[in-house]
Amino acid sequence: MSIARLLPRLISAAVTLLGVMVIVFVLVRVVPGDPIAMMISPGASPADIAALRAHYGLDLPLYQQFAVWFWQVLHGSFGTSISLKQNVLTVILQRLPATLELAFFALGLAVVWGTFIALLSTAWRGTMLEKLIDNFNGLMLAVPDFIWGLTFVLLLGVLLPVLPVSGRSDPAIDAKLFTQFYIVEGLLRGHFYFVWDVLKHMILPALTMSFPLAAVIGRVLKNAMMDVMVQDYILLARIKGLSNLRILLQEALRNAAVPALALTGVQFTFLIGGTVITERIFSYPGIGNLAIYAVINRDLPLIQGLVLTFGTFFILVNMAVDAMTAWLNPRLRHA
């Protein structure tokens, strides 16, 4: 991607982030509730309450509060969590690896499953199997994530307890890791039993998150492949004697991958946002669960930091998808 093409996107990203900061700052202060009231003891004096509000800068006018927060963000700090008494950025970075590993695992499942059902539906187009796949796709899209999650908990965690339904790993396993990237560091250090335990804890929440995304990928990829299958070069490939499987994989799938890739990148950002409910259901210690904790405790700095993190991630993923799409499509690459 050229500098001339990249610069407007960077400016647009900066303006978008500024807008996100303003909106979240206003919204968290419009919602009823006082974070200080949730911290103080019933017998606290008005002087103690005033001192606590001054400590967190909540006694300042709103424009000054925003200016302080904006200045902190520019210097790489999101402030101090009111409820946890820790640096907000530190708290987020401790939880972010768990969510990223879960999201990438769910994305991998969605891509594999979505591609499989798209290939199967395209290969058997016009048959009863295609109708069954389309109906199942509609079911995966229609049922909310939390219903899938509760169903998995009931079936595979209670009735047939074959998989763990809460947490990120077995507390009895001490892998002595230095980072929160359990899978990556576990593989690098050869702790394969620990990695397998982490994956087992991720299967149910990842399945819950991947179902709607797999349905979307499968539907878009199938439609794109159907358009490709009527092109002249597909007919030429058939005349040359290429098998249907080879035509599907080498011609149809490859040429239909660009729109599916762009959609996958956009949906991945919503996948990160969808971790809020899923992590709560499975007691998974990621930033989704942290977001609910922040809202319940009216932790304004933590809420602001989390929303800004989500916004930044959304922008970065979309820029990465644009760059990858341009790389795969020469017409966009030289635009």
Where are these regions (language model features)?
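N-terminal signal-anchor/first transmembrane alpha helix
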Residues: 1-59, 89, 93, 116, ...
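Alpha-helical transmembrane segments of integral membrane proteins
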Residues: 2-5, 17-20, 96-129, 176-335
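Residue-level signal for discrete positions within transmembrane alpha-helices
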Residues: 13, 95, 99, 107, ...
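Short amphipathic alpha-helical coupling elements at transmembrane boundaries
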Residues: 41, 51-54, 68, 72, ...
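An internal, D/E-rich "acidic patch" concept
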Residues: 59-115
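Hydrophobic alpha-helical segments embedded in or immediately adjacent to the lipid bilayer
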Residues: 116, 120, 129-179
